UniProtKB/Swiss-Prot annotation:
Highest taxon, organism lineage: Eukaryota
Residue ranges with Low complexity bias: 451-471, 994-1021, 1031-1044, 1230-1245, 1263-1276
Residue ranges constituting the Protein kinase domain according to the UniProt record: 18-316
Biological process per Gene Ontology, one example term: signal transduction
Cofactors demanded by this protein: Mg(2+)
Record-listed ATP binding positions: 24-32, 45
Protein name: Kinase and exchange factor for Rac A
Disordered: annotated span: 169-201, 360-426, 446-471, 994-1044, 1114-1145, 1208-1311
Family: Belongs to the protein kinase superfamily. TKL Ser/Thr protein kinase family.
Amino acid sequence: MVGGLPNSSLWNIEYDDLVFKDIIGKGNFGCVYRGNYLGVEVAIKQIPSFDDPDYCKYTEREVKALRYIRHPFVVHFFGACKHESGFYLITEFIEGLDLRRYLKSVPKPPKWLSRVNIALGVAKTFLFLHSKNLLHRDLKSKNILLDISRNQIKLCDFGFARVGSQYSNGSDSSSSEDESDSECVNGAAGGGGDDVYKNNGNGKPANYRLRRMSICGTPSFMPPEILLQQKYDWSVDVFSFGILCTELITLKRPGKDYWVRSQNNGFDINIEELNVNIPSPNDCPIQFYDLALKCCSYKHTNRPMFSTIVTILESIKLQLELFENQQQQQQLQQQQQLQQQQQQQQQQQQQQQQQLQLQQQQSSESSSSSSSQPLVNNNNNNSNCNNNNFNNSSNNNNSIANNDSISNVSTTTTSIPTTTTTTTTTTTTTNNITAINGTSNKYLQPLSKHQQQQQRNQNSSIIDNNSLIGSSNTESMITSFSISTFKERKKQSLNKLIRANTINILIGQQQQQQQQQQQQQQQQQDNQSSSQNQLIEREGVIKLDTTKYPNGWKEFGIDNSTNKIWIIYQSNIIKIGSNNNNNLIEMTCGTIIKLKKHSITLSIVDSNLISGANIINVKSYLKDYPYVNKPIKVNQQQQQQQQIITNNYELNLIIKLQSRIRGWLVRRRYKIFLSNWKLNNSNTSQSNKNQWIRLFNQLISSELEYKKQLDQVIKSYLLPIQSKFRINKPLLNYKEIGSIFSNIESLSEIHNELLKIVNQISKSPFFIMNFENEKDDRSNQNNTSATTDIFGDSSIQFTNISINTKDSSNQINSITQFIVKNISQIKNQYGIYAFNFKYSTNIYNWCRLNPDFSIFCDTIRSQLNQQFPDQENDLASLLSLPINKIQKYLLVFEKLAQITPITHSEYKDIKSAFTLIRETSNYIQSQLEMSFEHSHIMSIDIMLQKKDNQSLMQSGRWFIRQGQFTELSSNKQYYLFLLSDICLITKPIKSKSSKYNNNNNINTNNNNNNLTSSATQTNSNKDLSTSINQSTSNANSDNSGNNNNNLINSKYYYRLKTIINLKEEVSMRINPDISNGVLFIGPNKTYKWLLPNDEEAKDWVNDFERTTILIYRNNPNGGGSNNNSIGGGGGGRGGSGNNSNNGSIDLTEINQIHHINNQAIPLSSSNNNITNNNSINNNIIMNNNNNNNKDTEGKGFIKRFRLSFSAGTSTPERKTSLVNMSPSTTSSLNNIDSNYNNNNNNVTNTPIKSVTSSPSIHYTPVNDNNQQPQLPSQPNEEFQFTVPTTPSDKKKKRGSFSSKLKRLSITFSKD
């Protein structure tokens, strides 16, 4: 029975009852099918490799979590099925997309109410899970399914869920971590332990013991504490929820589109980057935005609990619902008003039709009666005239009825007080007649044709507007752009009314006179009347919202000095296009009558600007719109030029002439290119041509091979190690991964782009020289064979493709152009890799001391050897390939620059590429030298386990010595790192190994012997790397054997205990009470230590005294401060002292101090000097022993300093590295040194920041002008960095079980 499943058959499902359909998803652990189980649609998750313990562990957790969870927002669990084809989990099938695909596929951004509902559903789900002490640890948008039918979310994928959270009574058997660490086994309720673990997920105090949790989840949704491998609690789900909220806000993918986190800032987030990625318009609720940022707080204590999150989201949801209800009510009111307006208009139209019919009848009757009555006397002239006028009006009415156009009715009633009488003036446009003082028919006159047509246009526009104004597009435009609305004043001013009355009276009199004139005068009269009718002005008011515009009209640039303004408004006239309806944005001019702070009264003439129109913007008349037509003076020359340009014939002639010239230039260049490669009688040109083609073929073939090797490093080594790190079975931590592989992924991307360029330009005639105009069949055959050698396919036919000369400046047409345009990126990335190379080699050899990593590397190497037997498939060999790549480029382009003719099209590019590659090669060589200088401290920084993340790298600090010590009183093992200004006292801790960690009988005699032998070789001044190479080769042979039981985990970390600042009163001397013992006198404590032999004890004392003397020389007035931080202390070579000559070291002083302190000459000395110095040193050792027993015994630091100062002092020498380097690495470095000596130019050793691939480690070596660490005299000179050896296997009886678990041992030097 699978662990986690109940013994009853309730959760067991038979395989025959399952019906599999199509695949609906894929994940890290298997596929998900859509299926059927006993007539119910289900989702079937297949786990094929169920025998793997990791898969079993996570499957057991998922089953255990789903079996007991019953929540409407969690997928329902039906059961599990075990079969030969794999293990299957059967859950509820959700008809819908996951949240990630939904946000990606939605055509329009979803409403904020729906987004808040999704977030609220997730928060309620996690509030329930945390109340049951269950951590999900994999909250992301892909694990949230949207149930469309029920309009709710469903949470799935409980593979990383932790039942019982980190607080358990021991019943959770799924823990894969070491639970016996004394720092983690503390009762949360009892007060011991970290503050992180005092409460459960629901905020209540925890009562059970603490359990360390593993590292799992999706990196883009993981909080910083998980990525930094620190302790974490329930707040990790809150951080993931905050990332999910930002995804709902931006509708983009975190970790890809924004917030690509790195360890530069401790995996923190950037708020400015979030603000940039929010789509416009940014109408996100402020409370929702603040909640997302608060959940993404860097400190876990600042993140809220899900109970608080649910409360905030419910308040946001309530506000959004109220807002939407108000909008819906406003829309309903607008629709009702529109309907009422339409009904009123329909009634008015019906009334107008009835009136027209009555008038037609009356006109017909009056015409018949007038025709029957003869004209007898003059008294009836007025009536006849009136009848004629009325007949004219009836004719006009008949024409209106035939055209089916109905006029609008607008009535304005005002009272005009006078001294004698009170008259009522009404103005109507009914029946196309202008009536003044409606009680009398004296001034009844028909409208002109122009006025009738204008009224028809207005009426038709209003009718069309009323029929289409209810569309959603119009409402959205009104609500989104309008600043105010225009309201027409019902009561016009007295002056306006008088002006209108007088104008209308004059119009009526003129019309009566003009009717008796000819038809030519009638047209002039219509134009005058229409122009005068346009002079009728209307008054209106525009008011601003005081809350939106507190400064009033000043925000629009309008003040008391402004007389006229431009009014930009949304016209109610609808422009009906062929496909859609578009609102018109129009602009008119208005005169200011009265100006207040938030309101403006103006007069307008535009008839389209009616009451209720939306005002989009208001601007000053002259300031903001200077494009008003003004007279422009044009010179005669300008007029002539315009005439020439506007002449189409001459313009076409110029275009044809230019095209002919461009074509002639291209053909000429092509012929010159052909002539450069014509076969001549001389063998020199033919040999150069063949050599040119052969070099390019060699360059492309080597590029393909190099790219294949980089892919092997990434796919065979890097990706499997990263995948094991993600599934909680790490071979290395993220710092070690970044240290070993550096930025090799960036290098692979650069060469991938280069291969794309090669494939694109491979068909170009300028690249292969396969021309159609070439008549030499033999040359065509040679070119075809050349392409076959490059791409391995003789069937490929290369055609003649001409190069576009217009885009030649922006298009990359050759390999040399790619290198020239991308040389800065190549220089940067290869410089980073070279700076980290030595440091990467140290970390790789240290990590191979772990059997798990060693077996993994050997297994991958054996698999690659079977596939590629002719290549070097070892990881160390593959990592050394990029170091020589630029040197290979340099050799190829140096030869190409010599044999390429000057008239060749690529000659300039090849020449410039050669120059840039040479500069890049020198720069990489300088970075490689600096890597030897700083690699030791960088390696120590990775091996240390310290509380803070402060780096050891500092200007003027270098490595001196390291070694193992045993404390006499407690028999504890310590490890010391002596640097130029500080001393690190550490405690070794064995790394974890899944298969070989239980081997308690660690044989350390061999390691001690190696330590002794290496110490003796140091005194004899032999190559220290040979002994280490022999020991690592033996270790490799043991690791590659079939007997894995003999493997020993020799990889140790170093927990930092104390940092001793050498500026303080510290000293080290021989312990006279015991052999091989030293006394380390610190500022607060005296240590009694034991070393493996007497010679090593003397070496430690001498190196320590020289270091302290050098610090005193550089800082003669500076007493040590009580600063024990890693960055404390500034002494060392090139340190900042008061004397300008402190950084200079005399060679005689170096020799004297070496003789006094029993130390050999540095490695740069010859063998003869070494033998002589050894004989001298043997005599001085006896004298120094006597002096130590007699003279210096009991003397303080100042006396010993004076004794040494009389003979001169110098810095302790930097020793060669004892880290094992593979033969390929050594050979590659030797090749680089030989090439560098040939191409030695003046290069500034400018350090660059080490930017490695993610996960990565960053080091920034300091290169000050005043404080420059001295580089070695030779390019390939190495410094001594010994791999720490295994401590002695002296055991001490422990009183308790927990204290036995604290026993740690250390090793370093076996590969």
